[in-house]
Amino acid sequence: MNKQYFLSLFSTLAVALTLSGCWDKKQDEANAIQFNVNPIEITNYDETPKEVYPLVISFSGPAAPITSVNKELTQGISIEPALKGKWVWNSDTLLSFKPETDWPTGQDYRVKIDKKILNPQLHYTQKLNEPVVFKTPEFKATLVEQYFHQDPTQAQVRHAIFKLSFTHPVDRQKFEKALQVNLVRKNNDNTQNILSPLKFNVRYGEKDLVAWVNSDNVALAQSDNQYIEVKIDKNLTALLGNNSLETDIISSVKVPTKYSLDFSTGILIAQNEKNEAEQVLHLNFTHSIKGNELEKHISAYLLPEFTPENHPHWRYNLISRDVLQHAVAVPLQRLATETTYANQQSFKLDIPEKRCLYIEVQNKITALGGYEMKGALGDLACAPDYPKYVGFVGKGSILSSIGERKVTIATRNFTKVKLEIGRIQEEQLRHLIALNQGNFQNPDLGQLKIDNIADFFTKNYTLNNKKPQETTYLGIDLEKIVKQAEPAMGIYWLKVTGDSDNPNSTLRDTSQHMDWRNDASNQFSDYRLIVISDLGVIAKKAVDGTQSVFVQSISRGEPVEGATVSVISRNGSIIKSDYTNEQGVVNFSSLAHFKQELAPVMYLVSTQESLSFLPIDKYDRNLDYSRFDVGGIYASENAASLKAYLFNDRGIYRPNETLHTGIITKAQDWQLALNNIPLQFNLYSPSGMLMHKQTIRLEKSGLNSVSFTLPETAETGEWFAELLVTEKNNQTEIGSMTFQVQEFQPDNLKIKTTFNQAHAEGWVAPQDLVATVQLANLFGTPAQNRKVQANLTLQPLLPKFSQYADYRFFDNQRNKSAILYETELNEQVTDKEGKAHFPIDLTQYAENTAQMLYFTADGFENDSGRAVSTVKSVMVSAQPWLIGYQTKNDLAYLKRNTPAVVNFIAVNPKLEKVAVEHLKATLLERKYVSVLTQQASGAYKYESKLIENEIEQTTLQINATGTDFTLNTGKSGDYVLVLSNEHDQEVNRIHYAVIGNQNVSVAMDKNTELKLRLNKKQFKPHEEIEIAIHAPYAGTGLITIESDRVYAHKWFKATTNSSVQRIQLPENFEGTGYVNVQFSRDIHSDDIFTSPLSYGVVPFTVNVDNRRLKLQLDSPKKVKSGETVEFKLSSDKPSKALIYAVNEGILQVAGYQFTDPLSYFFPKYALQVQTAQILDLILPEFSKVMQFAQTGGDADMNMELAMKMAMANMNPFKRKTDKPVAYWSGIVDIHGEKTVSYQIPEEFNGNLKVMAIALSHDGKHLGHVATETLVRNDLILSPTVPLTLTPGDESEINVVIANNTNKAQRVNLKATLEPQLSFIGEAEKVIDIAPMSESRADFVIKATQELGSSTIRFIASYEDAQQQKVDAVRHVTLSVRPIMPKQFATQIQKVAAGKTVTSPLPMTLFPQHRQQSALFSAAPLALAQGVSTYLTHYDNYCTEQMISAAMPMVLFSKNPAYQPLLTALSRKAPQNVGSTGTHDTLEKAFKLLPSRQTEYGNYGIWNNVEEGNLFVTAYVAHFLIEARERHLVLPKAWFGQHGLFNNTISALEEQSVPQEGDSLATLRQRAYSAYLLTRLAKVPSNALLSIRTQLEQQFSAEEWQKDTVSAWLAAAYHMLKQDNEANKLIEPVINQLVAARPAQWTYDAYSDPLIKDSTMLYVIARHFPAQLSKVSDSVLERIVQDLNQQRYNTLSSSMVLLALDAYAQQHQSELANLQIQHQGKEISQSTPLFRFADLADTQMDISFVNNSQQPAWFALSQVGYPQNAAQQALSQGLEVDRSYTDKEGKPIRQVKIGDVIYVTVKIRASTDYVSDVIITDLYPAGFEVLWQQGAEDDFEDSWLAQHTELREDRLLSYLDAEKEMKVLKYQLKAVNIGTFQIPPIYAESMYDRAIKAYSASEGQIKVRK
């Protein structure tokens, strides 16, 4: 070792020791883990059982060992005084103790924590050395309420009530001992005397948390200073605990005297049933009195307007007898109270506003309890002002020009009103529309005032306000006001103001926003936009933007012909105009292209007599269809747009299988010629990675096919395929599909459930119900002796039946619990017919109601946990019939004294109508009344409750055809009609409301809806649709047929509420349509309190049989395996077809549905026509309003990388699987018929689903057809074998043999194994099997130490029909896989001159897939051995990893000295290295690089990216430059004008120029790019100068000069011969390399210390060789340290190789006196640079002998699978743990077949954050993960994983780990009997190989029968 190296090493060690010492000193209290004792919450006694909250000690860091989380601690922690309970680590930071019963109150405790129970990797506060002290919550009592109670029914019952609440259950005996109740007298000197102790009783609340103390009854007090006092002694304690109260609790209640009756008064304003204001005098008495007694002894006097002092405000002391003699007596009208005695009494009266009353009550009334007044009492009450109101009546803005033309104004309590009328100038109308921020009837123009666009008139009105409480109606005739020459028709802005005192305001509409004086009671002004016109307008906008405008006469209800309809733009231009035709319709093309000043704002409609308008695109004018069934698929605006139906052959695939996709593409209108249109097919993995891209060109028929073989490492989960069309440089998806990729097993069974009672679509009876489960083999025979498990759930439901969709049935359980009954049924075994019977008795749950029974059954394979499932539901009811009703009336809005009829039917369980007698119809009125109710304290009070009072009862009989029943509407109110049977059980209940004048305002807000019913749901083109319409009133309507546009329309008139209308469908209409009806009220109708417009929509379909291609598919009904079957497809037209057949067991797993493609092309489309209108704004005529006035008023990239890491963590010894039984014909031509053939696999038995889809050659007809072929041999073997085993595992396997012959068979069964397995016991069996029956044979196998896919061969010999011996053979495979995932190990060490170092192999690996080698060299090329091995074994996919993996071949392939190393790396013969061997790796990179390059020449991390990555682009360029310099052959096309290489250089030039705000990392990549350009002799002087300038301006010299950016710049300047600049820049780099660096570091932004060191070494060795001696020893030591600590990734490995290669070029030396020995023998081969040895044995001690005069380096590299699980857990930067428990969370090591175990995986990082971690969790053999669609996504949600994959033998999860623990839970199912080893769970960082963790060996888990 030279002096320089020694000094360097010594300095490094010294620095390291110094840093370590500093670190130890920093382990102080500030950095230690702290803890906090959270206060214990008081037990929640409201829960049942009570919820006792635990003691929780929270730590500031992950204090729990990860293996202890969620587990009970039984030692290492104690509590004093002792208390039974459980200590549990609830998380890694929370330690809790929960007592068995409850916490004693106010108890001090001490907790001692032994640090053995804590995470040993952390440093803890010194406070943990002391006991942790805490105190439980103290017992407290609170006096909540106290009052003197007078019983409302018994006058002599009066006493005090005190309510106390307690924090904990009180000790009853102690409480009653601590309690005193006394009658006391309180003196004026604050003393008191006890008059007498009182008896008391105590009522306790639930769980003794509340107590009501009721004193004994007392007489009325003789004086007003008597009290009932309660005292609770402070010595009171809780039932559990010893702490007492802090002080005594004392409180008292005053005892009233006999003369304590008093009252207070007030006058309020209330609304009466006529909607008028009236005065009500309220008297509030201190005790309950009788109203009829008060009425006799009360007087009211209207005082003079002014007091004797001439003041308007009266005071009580001003009232004298003299005043009263001059006062006027006021009559009072008593209002009834709900009870005889009441505290509040009320009287109607009528006095002038602001006048005062004197109320006098004589002392001749006695209150309940004997209370009286000493003498007559009086009080003063003054009347408030009546509310003021002025406003327009009704909602709307349109007055018919043919009608009365009167606007109705309602006023109250105003003497005068002012009406301002602004006539909008027609040319200014556009401003009103364009600037309106409000709605139509109340516009808000913002800054623009109406004065600017209108001509104004003003009219003042004086009103007779003698009765300010009454409403006055004014009918304003606008025609008379504007009686100038012009007609009154037009558009007006009206504002009405009450009592206006400022008539000369500059701007009339200053209160355009609502008047600030308005409040809840008063309205001083109102404004409205009024249109006087006879033109109603409806506009319908289609999906393509075309417009249909309908114009009708408001007065006549008829379409208006010849009206001018103009589209007005924002600037007032007429951009379109036309006349309506005889149907009142005008059509416009799309207005979408009119923009800015020409943007359309309204339709202006005019005739010679009338003018109207409709704003365009105003939300308040659009009809809201959200309450109708208008949802569905949205059609494209372009009828010629393409739509594609993508389908696959089976819905689920295993990795490495071929996906077959059929594509049917059609234009939306089926008219466009499709031939040769290019489309793009993209296929994405579950992580969103583009896996396949293919351009297809459409066939003329529209049928195409794409096939793609999935990678062997294909991600599991849901894959996505899409078809894109390119339009104007944009890609649009026109079709897509999803499918599953899973390592699944096809089903072998099928299952079906039936019930013994035939119920059709009705229900079954609850008694004598039997569910029969039929289990069958998929090859058609009963599955005998199979276990079947079942459970049932009973839920209430509201019965509904499709054939009686309009009838409402009843369920009296509908408000009860969601689940009525749930149970597991006894396990059954199938009989010879494959049936298992489950008797079900639901009698006790039936009652007189209906429930839905959900019956779930699982049928299991023989002695296996694999099962098939089914769910069957049926309605259950004990009733022999159910009653339903329907009505055409709106039952929430029935007018008084108008007929309303409901129709009743009764149906039996078969849903046949039947007659029912002896029913009763009881009418009940629902109202709230006061009901005497006992309180929790024991006292009685009146409470308001909803009750139902019987009004009348009638008998009812329902006929077999149904019976009409007329509802009673004679009186307004809320009613229920209850139907009951002869046993008084409710069988239906109808709620309805009768609306009277008092609630007409409610009716006005009601949303009126048409009821529409079509005569059927599906029609043929050109057929007539019959529509039954029920409207709220008579009127006129418009019917339209709509979907994406209006296809047909028809006007109609209805003189009654109900009518039947008809409209004809167009001939060319296909698919889904909507009947849309707008119905406007007749202006002469009396129904003015509902909206003038009602509307409704109902969908329908037109069948598409004319598009259906007639197909017939023939296949053999039954064949045997190995035979060739023919499928014949016939068509009535020349066609293109796809024929495919699939094993039904696969389709069953996938849930595959063979659907009709026509239903895809003709789905339920959404209603996309937008309807705008003004008909809902029509105001009622003034005369109609006055009729009622008499009675009423108005994925990021890191995640993608993680996905691709899966390959390295999969099972390389996975079993060989059979090819799926599936056939795909590809597209074939059919001219009449076509026959294709398929050979059935030799060992397949099951059912083939045969399917075909075809399109006619012209593409206008489409069909699909399916059939089945049964494949069944005479003797069928069905083995049950685990999918995987681990060496040493034992498992029972079995074979079920089905004898499908007609005679009994004696079968000789023999099983043979491969070396991976051995038998325990015999391998041959003799079995007797009855004809058409099954039997089984059992074997026991054990896995040996041989890894790999192993085949078990079963041979069954039997006699065929000719009595010849025949063999039936079945092969089944399983995987014998190692217990640990793949491991890498590299050991690098320096050997001093003249020394020998002997080292054992780091790991003991299985021979299979093992690679072990040693390299020894005087140059540090030994370092290259480890990283090269790692790179070539790393499964890489992203661009950086792909380039890194190819780098060893680029650097070494042309150097003969590296041939042994390359031989080992490529695993090929030496003569092939440099040719075929390198081609495999390099061609992979060369093939993928074009897909990673963007159109701009740069490169993305993955393919199909839009943006390139700076570093990746430079790195690829570096790779290409190195390859070209080393004379590797690159594709010639890359060097063309737009070739890959030249485009890469262009991208380098582009990205070498810095941008403002670049980070240091970005400038580093730009400098890297500039360096590479310099290598290519392209002088990037400007870029270099700009980078340098930006570095100096934005970053400190300390920051950037020690960064890699400085090295790249120095190298570039050196090549440009600017040595002074180069030397200045390289000097800080050299200093950085010899300086110490932090021990802790991470990878970020393509940089870490190892990448930095190797990059700098590369630059110095290549460009500054003279400086190499300054850094080589120190930097090589660091690199060795990092490699030995496994702290390398693909990029750092590649950069190390580049550096070592450059170093070797400067240190060429001959190999001398170096040997690699084993047991004293030389085992290496020599090259000019190093000695190399392949190591073949499992265990070897390797000696490295250095007999030279200089130091040498050796490297031991191993890649493979460890033979044994580690006995100790490993935690390097990560901690990981996994547990197996049952459902209750108890650890388990033994389960029964079919049981589910619950897996919990926990992970956390030792630092704050570790990115890109992969977890590999191998399942024990004999278990399978419970997979279901979406399972991967569920796992992701549960612990924020980036991706989770479920494989056949393991779970792979990718995530970022944090200091906070993450938890993943999933489930495994025991499917095989045996004893299986539990593999450790393994986690590692994908970028920092030193960060990893695994759990210790956990022994075995046993699965038994």
Swiss-Prot record:
* Signal sequence interval, chain numbering: 1-21
Q: How does it sit in the membrane?
A: Lipid-anchor
Isoglutamyl cysteine thioester (Cys-Gln) crosslink: positions?
Answer: 1438-1441
Task: Extract the InterPro entries matched here.
Answer: A2M_N_BRD (IPR011625), Alpha_2_Macroglob_MG3 (IPR021868), Bact_A2M_MG5 (IPR041203), Bact_A2M_MG6 (IPR041462), Bact_MG10 (IPR041246), Macroglobln_a2 (IPR001599), MG2 (IPR002890), Terpenoid_cyclase/PrenylTrfase (IPR008930)
Main localization is: membrane
- The record places the lipid (S-diacylglycerol cysteine) at 22
Record-linked SMART domains: A2M, A2M_N_2
Lipid addition (N-palmitoyl cysteine) is recorded at 22
Keyword list, A-Z: Cell membrane, Lipoprotein, Membrane, Palmitate, Protease inhibitor, Signal, Thioester bond
Question: Which molecular-function annotations from GO does this UniProt entry contain?
Answer: endopeptidase inhibitor activity
Q: Where in the cell is it found?
A: Cell membrane
Taxonomy, superkingdom: Bacteria
UniProt KW Secreted keyword? no
Keyword Cell membrane part of the UniProt annotation: yes
Give a Gene Ontology cellular component term annotated to this protein.
plasma membrane
**What job does this protein perform?**
Protects the bacterial cell from host peptidases.
Family, similarity comment: Belongs to the protease inhibitor I39 (alpha-2-macroglobulin) family. Bacterial alpha-2-macroglobulin subfamily.
The entry's protein name is Alpha-2-macroglobulin
From what organism does this protein derive? Pasteurella multocida (strain Pm70)
